[in-house]
């Protein structure tokens, strides 16, 4: 999965961000799936990363995508 998705960060937008938001929602978050990587997506991502034992940097890179799998 990780190789199929680009690195995403605050300010990113598009279909890949929608996929990230959907994955976070499957992990228990309640994000609007709007394709915009705003503050709510960043906060949810950082919380997810923290809970998963990763450095909570708010960037969806290969480790985050692999964990969200």
Regions flagged by a language model, labelled:
Residues 45:
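Conserved hydrophobic/aromatic packing and binding residues within compact polymer-binding modules
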Residues 1-34:
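Acidic, Ser/Thr/Pro/Gly-enriched interdomain connector segments
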Residues 24-28, 33, 49-56, 68:
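Sec/Tat-exported extracytoplasmic proteins
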Residues 63-69:
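Short hydrophobic/aromatic patches at helix-to-coil boundaries
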